[in-house]
Each structure stands twice: as C-alpha cells, then as structure tokens.
Amino acid sequence: ELLVSKLFHDKNYFEFYITSDDVKSLKPHPMPFLKAIKLSGIKITNSIVFEDSNPGLKSACSANLPTICVKSNLPIIYDKDIPLKCLVDTIGDVKHLTNIIKGPQLNRDYIDYEYLNDFINNYQ
C-alpha cells in the first residue's frame, strides 16, 4: 500500500488495489485477477489485462482473461508455454506510437477503445 501511495502521491485514482496480503495464492495463480474481477463487480467478459511479466501473464491466462503483454524495460524472455495473443512495445498515445510485435493490427498509431473492444470480442 505504501508503494501505491508513493507512486500516485496519495491521490485516489483506483477504487481498490490488491496486494499479496489480499489473496491466498499469488501470481502465477489466477487468484489475484479473479479477486479483482469480483471486487470490481464487472463481468469477466468486459475485462482486459495489461501485463509485463511471466508470472502476471500466466496468472491472467490461467484466469482466461484477454491479455495484452506490454514489453518491459527489463529484459524478459517470455515462457514458451504462455499463449501470447498480443505483444506491444507500449500502450502508446498520440505522442508515443504503439508498435504491435504480435497480434491484431492497429487502426490508429496507439491502442484505443475500438482496438480493446475488438480484442476482447475476438479473444476466444
């Protein structure tokens, strides 16, 4: 909680966040994501995960959640058993363009609502 508080300067950008104290099983187990879905009250079919680590990717995929892998600044060799359907170098915005390394192509130069909606609907 202290890290989140420091990173966001005590501003309340999130309704909740989940730490290792909140779940019995940590990533790569799907429990952290499933708990987030439950607490949020949204449907699992309206969810999407952005991840940058092997444990997080395994966790999201085990929870059967549409997952976009965003490359980290840290050198990571992705596990071959993780079914990566989308890998990008950055989420992007109008000043920082997104490059799709693997996955559906963009209609714009960054990930937008339309892309996310199509990705969720075509995930299975």
Can you describe what each PLM-predicted range is?
Residues 1-124:
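Asp-based, Mg2+/Mn2+-dependent phosphohydrolase catalytic module
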